[in-house]
């Protein structure tokens, strides 16, 4: 390979790390303004025995800092001698390991010449990969004794470079930076961090690179102190008491003004006395009719004064108010009621009547003791609540209480509010607020933002959204006025700005979405607005500019917080346009979160060491610390423990000395000082001035067909397109029920000239459908955005569809109404296809290519405006499930029979058509040739790979009998695949054992970004599969790494530590895929096995257990041999068979990969390795409760049979064994290998086995409508259902298997299992139970599986009640929720 090719391969798709900068990147010349800051590094002037290469030491520090401030583990740097360093950094490395890695990389680079410029290389890559733009290969640099310019390269503009100058017998570090991006203050902090990090690393090189503090002396005072007293005992009183005091002090002052509707020219104005009196009446009614302190009262509300009256009435009664918006569908309203479980209900007259569905739910499910059916305040200040049967108003008897306080005492920890935030599976979480927070911050805010009793506030927040509390309580605290617009004022573009101007509003609370509504198509200025407080979502510069164009005196305050932090938020203030016209120009696109308000801290915590606060620029997770946090989630104690945590920086009772009992009447409702943090799940970093900026979600990821995708990242890139105004990317199910990325966006209508270039005519007949209209009218814009994104996103992160809309729908809370944004229906997509002018040049295609193109377009979810012969099926929106449909449609329409793997081998139109041409011209079938070729490859490949094995392996001896020795010895077991189905049970089996003189510690391999994330994955898998026990945690050590890499990518030191610790290796991890060819499975299933096995070649001797699969036997030879042996009275295929008779003939890539791995392991056994190959068949649900991996062939067959109503008459026996027994065999053979002097095989077979037909017909026994059909008839029924009628069926992804001679493919040879029996017999000494007789799957066991599938929603309930009742099983709610959400739909179990 030439040097040029080496560099091209090395620099494929590099990560261009961006050091956090202070100013926007210039979009036009000049792009750079070079500046330099220099500092002495005396630490490097003295010799260090361990670090001979001083340049590598300093480079290591720079790499560590880059990782800490960007989170990028792919480090790419331009370095000395015209080279580019690229390596993966690990957060668990010590500085020694980092230095060693970099030093080794530098030595390797010395042998690779770069006798060309990297500009030339980038142009070569552009040409080779046919890129539209020359790729940038690096953005950061670290040099030595080099005079460097940031714009030295044509295609690689450098942001920040460090140059180590050793020319004067001293070490001077020059920081060369673009001052158009970075402030002097930022650069000084980076220099201080570098110096501090270098000192710490050299003083103790064993320090973990992610745990060396980045808080410097110069920046410490800018950052929050997590041990500071935040006024835990400073309760200022309850908001309703403060309001009553105000009402008595100035009763005639205007409190609420409802502005007139279209049919009226008169406002409705109410005084503080009016609101106080009417709310007193409501409060006394609630109390007298049974509402107790702490009861929840639900308010069915409209926007207006009535809501204020109801809220105050509920609070005065000592109760908790919650609000339902009538805009929500009735079914959704019942969900909120189910979470809240109210004891009281108030219906505001203006909100209308409750839907009958809601009334039925209230009557059937709730225990309502107090109800007001039609509350409305009259213009004269009196209150009505609805008529009784005698004609009297329900509230009339309580009118005499209008000037009487209730006397109900509540305290700082009483719960005045129940607000809702999103939850899993569409079930909202109810957040209980605290009285401490409601009024605590208003006094500070009035001083900080100059808010007074003369201000006019607005009621613009969603009425069921917690910011509505700010709208109401802020003016009530101050004695100010609240103005209420009509729905027409809010909903008519441009009208809300006119309303703000007409009524002279001075202060408003907005969400960014409501702010966009305020400014959309608005021309009327509202200069009296002096403050706009934004909450609820990210606030962009564009949002601020639009608002200040109309409100030039408005200071904009971005407030960061959540429903869970209640009023405890941070703030960042944008100066008004009049105060500083250029203020926004200096800021980046997204407004920072700023600093905490009075006694509120945003703690950005080191993700690898939570005892550390992050330094300036370092990415961490944001925790909010304050005395004003909400109480927690209603009825979710486990989630409360996870999200509301005690401050670990101080002792739990540290602040108790501050709590002075002065006989306050509320003291019984006070839990004392509680220093708590709310874990937001947001990532953030500190700016040089101590402000905080958000960097996305720690969990803002989705998984599409195995790829982890950040939705926030996609939206950020799309928002940078010059014609995009608003955008949101979501995951939606398409017509095939496949999760699909789809972007909804609003274009820049204020740029009509630019936009017109991308507009197309829309036929009148489809103009009324906004989705169809957008897809047709702006398909050129969508194409341009996709082109724009190709340069910025990986192909799998590209939205499958971009829908252009006139506006994004908002929910009543002023946020984007995501449920209304759904994947277009097939009818809509067909209309788009019929009415879009194709830009495809037919002359580019041959006849067969044209047929292939048209066939693909007929089954793809979206129809691209242009297609070329070089377009890939997958680039056009295809995936493995659609590939199944495509292959069957091909067979039906073109009479060409191709195996499914063909599309993976020939993915473009041109290549796929050429393969069809070849098959037709040869008159043969592709399948035979492909199989023959691949068959030869896997066996030959395995033989070649054996040559890479060590010449010998140390042989381990058996463990001492578990009950024969004194003392306790720890057995250390390294296990792969622990987050999969079988792996989860292996882990549980190991850690559930308690032999007398042994304990177990599991070294669990998990792929994740860090140990915390890895453990979370492992724990989630355990909960999902029903195996997790909290006691396991202390006996688990997570091992990070990539099994496909030598030494898993670990340093030599860590590798040897592991090798010298581990006693047993259980290699269970594998990629299970029924379509992928051997080539795609070679790395995860074969190479990884060699790498795991290499752990047994060094250090202490180990047993090696490998989980294989009976798919290694799936050849005609073994089917015939099995029949022969059984006819002779023998049990079946011997465990001693060397499998050389399936060295050819295996047709599936998965079985081939397992065969190759087994072959290599047996050869290692000949060289001394001891242990066992465990060969299970179908690994099925847990025997006790059916816990299963729902993405399973046999379970899909159950569901598909229910959906079709038919089952095939197939008499084959099925080798099914419950997962807990398979795990038992794996662990038993790992502790007690069957053979002492050789590496043997243990086959897992069911005792008894069940016939395939009987397995499926169990559905009938438990009340499902299924009938038996011959396989040929059943096949036609399924094909007609799925292919012809497009009906949903769980077997859809497996059509290639179930419609292709299923009676043959479900054959399972009978197996000898004497080795498994021997190990289980020996295992009796370890477990106290003899399992050597084995277990299988009976009809009764299938009943348990059906019960499980019912409980998690995978199967519908049985249709007949006169059959067997489903068995009773026990599952935790957490497991049900996870499985129902799809968490159990994939597993890494090696067994098929």
UniProtKB/Swiss-Prot annotation:
It comes from Saccharomyces cerevisiae (strain ATCC 204508 / S288c). Binds 1 phosphopantetheine covalently. The lineage of its organism: Eukaryota, Fungi, Dikarya, Ascomycota, Saccharomycotina. Its EC number is 1.2.1.31, 1.2.1.95. It is an enzyme of class 1 (oxidoreductase). Keywords: Amino-acid biosynthesis, Isopeptide bond, Lysine biosynthesis, NADP, Oxidoreductase, Phosphopantetheine, Phosphoprotein, Ubl conjugation. One of its GO terms (molecular function) is L-aminoadipate-semialdehyde dehydrogenase activity. Residues 843-920 form the Carrier domain. InterPro entries: AA_adenyl_dom (IPR010071), ACP-like_sf (IPR036736), AMP-bd_C_sf (IPR045851), AMP-binding_CS (IPR020845), AMP-dep_synth/lig_dom (IPR000873), ANL_N_sf (IPR042099), Far_NAD-bd (IPR013120), Lys2 (IPR014397). Present with 7430 molecules/cell in log phase SD medium. Belongs to the ATP-dependent AMP-binding enzyme family. This is L-2-aminoadipate reductase. The gene is LYS2. The keyword Transcription regulation does not apply. Transmembrane segments: none annotated.
């Amino acid at each position: 390979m030439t040097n040029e090719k080496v560099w091209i391969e090395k620099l494929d798709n590099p990560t261009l790390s961006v050091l956090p900068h202070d100013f926007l990147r210039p979009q036009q010349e000049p792009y750079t303004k070079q500046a330099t800051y220099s500092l002495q590094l005396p630490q490097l002037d003295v010799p260090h025995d361990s670090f001979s290469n001083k340049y590598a030491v300093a480079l290591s520090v720079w790499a560590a800092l880059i990782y800490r401030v960007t989170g990028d583990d792919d480090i790419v740097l331009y370095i000395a001698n015209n080279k580019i360093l690229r390596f993966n950094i690990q957060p668990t490395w010590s500085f020694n390991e980092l230095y060693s890695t970099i030093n080794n990389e530098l030595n390797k680079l010395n042998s690779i010449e770069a006798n060309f410029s990297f500009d030339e290389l980038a142009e070569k890559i552009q040409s080779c990969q046919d890129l539209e733009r020359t790729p940038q290969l690096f953005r950061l640099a670290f040099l030595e004794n080099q005079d460097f310019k940031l714009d030295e390269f044509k295609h690689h503009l450098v942001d920040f470079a460090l140059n180590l100058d050793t020319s004067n017998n001293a070490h001077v570090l020059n920081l060369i930076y673009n001052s158009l991006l970075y402030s002097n203050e930022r650069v000084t902090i980076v220099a201080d961090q570098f110096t501090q990090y270098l000192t710490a690393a050299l003083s103790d090189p064993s320090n973990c690179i992610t745990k060396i503090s980045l808080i410097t002396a110069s920046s410490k005072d800018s950052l929050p102190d997590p041990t500071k007293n935040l006024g835990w005992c400073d309760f200022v009183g309850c908001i309703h008491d403060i309001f009553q005091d105000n009402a008595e002090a100035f009763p005639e002052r205007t409190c609420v003004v409802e502005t007139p509707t279209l049919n009226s020219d008169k406002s409705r104005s109410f005084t503080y006395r009016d609101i106080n009196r009417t709310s007193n009446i409501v409060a006394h009614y609630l109390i007298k009719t049974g509402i107790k302190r702490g009861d929840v009262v639900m308010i069915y509300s409209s926007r207006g004064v009535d809501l204020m009256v109801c809220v105050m009435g509920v609070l005065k009664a000592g109760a908790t108010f919650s609000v339902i918006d009538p805009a929500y569908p009735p079914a959704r309203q019942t969900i909120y009621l189910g979470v809240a479980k109210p004891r009281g209900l108030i219906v505001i007259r203006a909100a209308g009547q409750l839907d009958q569905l809601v009334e039925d739910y209230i009557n059937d499910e709730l225990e309502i003791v107090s109800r007001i059916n039609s509350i409305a305040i009259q213009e004269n200040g009196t209150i009505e609540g609805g008529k009784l049967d005698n004609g009297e108003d329900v509230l009339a008897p309580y009118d005499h209480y209008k000037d009487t306080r209730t006397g109900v005492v509540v305290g700082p920890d009483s719960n005045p509010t129940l607000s809702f935030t999103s939850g899993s599976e569409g079930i909202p979480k109810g957040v209980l607020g605290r009285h401490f927070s409601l009024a605590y911050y208003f006094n500070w805010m009035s001083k900080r933002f100059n808010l007074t009793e003369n201000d006019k506030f607005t009621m613009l927040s969603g009425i069921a959204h917690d910011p509505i509390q700010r709208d109401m309580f802020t003016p009530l605290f101050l004695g100010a006025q609240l103005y209420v617009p009509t729905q027409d004022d809010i909903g008519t573009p441009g009208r809300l700005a006119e309303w703000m101007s007409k009524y002279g509003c001075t202060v408003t609370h907005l969400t960014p979405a409501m702010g966009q509504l305020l400014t959309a198509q608005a021309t009327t200025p509202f200069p009296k607005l002096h403050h706009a407080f934004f909450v609820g979502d990210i606030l962009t510069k564009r949002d601020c500019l639009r608002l200040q164009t109309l409100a030039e005196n408005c200071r904009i305050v971005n407030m960061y917080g959540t429903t869970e932090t209640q009023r405890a938020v941070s703030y960042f203030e944008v100066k008004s346009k009049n105060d500083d016209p250029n203020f926004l120009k200096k800021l980046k696109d997204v407004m920072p979160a700023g600093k905490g308000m009075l006694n509120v801290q945003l703690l950005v915590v080191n993700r690898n060491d939570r005892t550390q606060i992050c330094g300036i620029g370092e990415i961490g997770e944001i925790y909010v610390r304050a005395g004003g946090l909400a109480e927690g989630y209603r009825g979710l104690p486990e989630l409360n423990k996870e999200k509301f945590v005690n401050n670990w920086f101080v002792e739990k009772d540290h602040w108790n000395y501050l709590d002075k009992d002065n006989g306050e009447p509320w003291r019984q409702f006070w839990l004392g000082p509680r220093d708590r943090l709310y874990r937001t799940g947001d990532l953030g970093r500190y700016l040089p001035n101590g402000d905080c900026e958000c960097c996305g979600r720690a969990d803002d990821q989705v998984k599409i067909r195995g790829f982890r995708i950040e939705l926030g990242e996609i939206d950020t890139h799309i928002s940078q397109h010059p014609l995009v105004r608003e955008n949101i990317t979501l995951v939606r199910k398409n017509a095939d029920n496949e999760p699909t990325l789809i972007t909804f966006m609003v274009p820049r209508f204020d740029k009509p000239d630019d936009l017109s270039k991308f507009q197309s005519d829309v036929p009148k007949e489809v103009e009324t459908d906004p989705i169809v209209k957008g897809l047709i009218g702006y398909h050129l814009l969508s194409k341009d955005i996709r082109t724009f994104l190709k340069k910025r996103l990986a192909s799998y992160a590209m939205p499958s569809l971009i829908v252009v809309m006139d506006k994004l729908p908002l929910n009543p809370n002023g946020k984007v109404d995501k449920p209304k944004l759904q994947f277009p229906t097939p009818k809509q997509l067909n209309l788009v296809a019929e009415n879009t002018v194709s830009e495809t040049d037919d002359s580019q295609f041959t006849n067969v290519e044209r047929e292939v193109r048209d066939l693909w377009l007929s089954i793809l979810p979206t129809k691209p405006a242009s297609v070329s012969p070089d377009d890939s099926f997958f680039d056009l929106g295809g995936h493995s499930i659609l590939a199944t449909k495509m292959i069957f449609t091909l067979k039906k329409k073109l009479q060409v029979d191709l195996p499914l793997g063909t599309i993976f081998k020939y993915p473009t139109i041109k290549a796929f058509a050429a393969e069809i041409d070849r098959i037709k011209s040869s008159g043969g079938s592709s399948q035979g040739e492909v199989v023959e070729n691949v068959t030869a490859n896997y066996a030959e490949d395995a033989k070649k790979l054996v040559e890479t094995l060590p010449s010998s392996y140390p042989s381990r001896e058996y463990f001492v009998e578990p009950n024969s020795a004194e003392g306790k010895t720890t057995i250390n077991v390294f296990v792969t695949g622990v987050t999969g189905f079988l792996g989860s049970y292996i882990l549980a089996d190991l850690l559930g054992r308690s032999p007398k003189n042994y304990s177990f510690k599991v070294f669990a391999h998990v792929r994740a970004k860090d140990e915390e994330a890895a453990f979370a994955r492992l724990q989630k898998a355990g909960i999902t599969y029903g195996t997790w026990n909290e006691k396991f945690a202390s006996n688990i050590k997570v091992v990070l790494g990539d099994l496909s890499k030598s030494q898993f990518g670990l340093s030599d030191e860590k590798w040897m530590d592991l090798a010298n610790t581990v006693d047993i290796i259980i290699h269970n991890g594998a990629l299970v895929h029924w379509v992928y060819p051997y080539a795609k499975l070679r790395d995860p299933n074969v190479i990884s096995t060699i790498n795991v096995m290499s752990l047994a070649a060094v250090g202490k001797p180990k047993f090696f257990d490998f989980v294989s699969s009976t798919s290694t036997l799936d050849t005609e030879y073994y089917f015939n041999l099995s029949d022969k042996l059984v006819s002779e009275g023998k049990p079946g295929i011997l465990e001693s068979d060397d499998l050389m008779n399936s060295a050819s003939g295996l047709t599936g890539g998965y079985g081939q990969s397992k065969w190759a791995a087994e072959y290599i392991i047996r050869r290692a056994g000949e060289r001394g390795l001891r242990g066992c190959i465990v060969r299970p068949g179908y690994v099925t649900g847990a025997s006790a409760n059916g816990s299963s991996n729902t993405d399973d062939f046999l379970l899909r067959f159950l569901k598909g049979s229910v959906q079709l109503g038919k089952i095939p008459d197939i008499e084959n026996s099925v080798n099914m064994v419950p997962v807990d027994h398979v795990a038992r065999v794996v662990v038993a053979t790992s502790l007690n290998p069957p053979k002492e002097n050789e590496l043997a095989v243990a086959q897992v077979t069911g005792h008894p086995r069940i016939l395939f037909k009987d397995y499926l017909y169990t559905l009938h026994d438990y009340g499902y409508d299924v009938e038996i059909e011959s396989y040929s008839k059943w096949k036609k029924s399924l094909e007609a259902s799925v292919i012809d009628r497009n009906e949903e069926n769980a077997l859809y992804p497996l059509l290639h298997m179930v419609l292709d001679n299923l009676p043959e493919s479900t054959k399972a040879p009978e197996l000898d299992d004497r080795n498994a029996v021997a190990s289980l017999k020996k295992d009796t000494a370890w477990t106290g139970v003899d399992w050597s007789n084995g277990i299988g799957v009976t009809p009764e066991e299938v009943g348990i599986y059906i019960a499980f599938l019912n409980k998690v929603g995978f199967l519908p309930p049985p249709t007949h009640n006169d059959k067997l009742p489903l068995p009773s099983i026990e599952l935790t709610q957490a497991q049900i929720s996870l499985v129902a959400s799809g968490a159990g739909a994939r597993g890494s179990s090696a067994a098929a």
